[in-house]
Structure formats: structure tokens, C-alpha cells
Amino acid sequence: MPTIKLQSSDGEIFEVDVEIAKQSVTIKTMLEDLGMDDEGDDDPVPLPNVNAAILKKVIQWCTHHKDDPPPPEDDENKEKRTDDIPVWDQEFLKVDQGTLFELILAANYLDIKGLLDVTCKTVANMIKGKTPEEIRKTFNIKNDFTEEEEAQVRKENQWCEEK
């Protein structure tokens, strides 16, 4: 199987099967635009927005999911679920918050829908059922509202909390 070289933002080069790399719509489009469709090339494809540690994780995820069917198109009317993350992905995403957020940014930049979906669902699950104070604590967010501002926001959004 032909391979391609991917270069991370910090200069590390990864040799990857072309079919695995093409799970990224961004890389697939680059290869098509450069006329490097399947024959491979010695010049690495630069990925200036992804460092080596994160690119290594992305390649690991893509390798595991190489035989998956393409993810379905989003249906605007369909309710989004966050309880359908495969066990392998749950284990794979047991990383620190910084790494998780870097994976979201990389999946978005590289346009890998399946990875973007599971990383965002993981963050959604970290938020689900928590109070604003618990969410702030989880994500180390400083509350910069004055007491008056907070009271005003609570008043305006009171309907949200009614059960």
C-alpha cells in the first residue's frame, strides 16, 4: 500500500498509509490538488496546526478506524446522542483536558468527522448534568460576573431551570 509523509508543526515526520491519511478530508483534498492521489511522494505534507504528539494520536485513531464506514451526514432534526461512544474510543480519549482539546482542534483542522464527533461528545459528557459552578471547576474557568450580573442572567434564563 502506498504511503505518505506527514510533517507536524514541530517538524516530526510520520510515514502513513495513504488510505489512512485520507480519512482526513483536508489531507485528501491536498493530495488531489497536488496530483499526489495514490502514488505517494517523498515530500512531506506539512500540517502546521498539529504538533507531533497530537498527530501521533490522530494517526493512531485513524488506523484503528480505517475500515469504518463513512460517518452519516448530520441530520439537523435528529437529536444528538452522547452515550454512543465506542469502548475503544472511550479508552483512547482518557487523556488530560489539554490533549482532548488539542485533539478537537486537530480533528476540526484535518476535517476528520468521526474523531471530531467522539471528542466533542466526550466534552459534552463532562458538562452534562453539572451546575455552572461544577462546569467552571471542571474546566478551570474563572467566574467574572459580578453578583448583580449573575442575578440578572439567572433571572433572564429562569425558564431553563424549571422542571
Swiss-Prot record:
Native source organism of the sequence: Rattus norvegicus
Pathway the protein contributes to: Protein modification; protein ubiquitination
Post-translational modification: Undergoes autophagy-mediated degradation in the liver in a time-dependent manner.
Subunit structure: Interacts with KDM2B, forming heterodimers. The KDM2B-SKP1 heterodimeric complex interacts with the PCGF1-BCORL heterodimeric complex to form a homotetrameric polycomb repression complex 1 (PRC1.1). Component of multiple SCF (SKP1-CUL1-F-box) E3 ubiquitin-protein ligase complexes formed of CUL1, SKP1, RBX1 and a variable F-box domain-containing protein as substrate-specific subunit. Component of the SCF(FBXW11) complex containing FBXW11. Component of the SCF(SKP2) complex containing SKP2, in which it interacts directly with SKP1, SKP2 and RBX1.
Known role: Essential component of the SCF (SKP1-CUL1-F-box protein) ubiquitin ligase complex, which mediates the ubiquitination of proteins involved in cell cycle progression, signal transduction and transcription. In the SCF complex, serves as an adapter that links the F-box protein to CUL1. The functional specificity of the SCF complex depends on the F-box protein as substrate recognition component. SCF(BTRC) and SCF(FBXW11) direct ubiquitination of CTNNB1 and participate in Wnt signaling. SCF(FBXW11) directs ubiquitination of phosphorylated NFKBIA.
Gene Ontology BP, a term: SCF-dependent proteasomal ubiquitin-dependent protein catabolic process
Name of the protein: S-phase kinase-associated protein 1
InterPro entries: SKP1, SKP1-like, SKP1-like_dim_sf, SKP1/BTB/POZ_sf, Skp1_comp_dimer, Skp1_comp_POZ
Location of Phosphothreonine modifications: 131
Residues in cross-link Glycyl lysine isopeptide (Lys-Gly) (interchain with G-Cter in SUMO1): 142
Family matches, as SUPFAM superfamilies: POZ domain (SSF54695), Skp1 dimerisation domain-like (SSF81382)
One of the record's GO molecular function terms: cullin family protein binding
Region named Disordered: 63-83
Keyword Phosphoprotein tagged: yes
Biological classification of the source: Eukaryota, Metazoa, Chordata, Craniata, Vertebrata
PANTHER family linked: SKP1
Gene label: Skp1
Family: Belongs to the SKP1 family.
Record Gene3D superfamilies: Potassium Channel Kv1.1, Chain A (3.30.710.10)
Keywords: Isopeptide bond, Phosphoprotein, Ubl conjugation, Ubl conjugation pathway
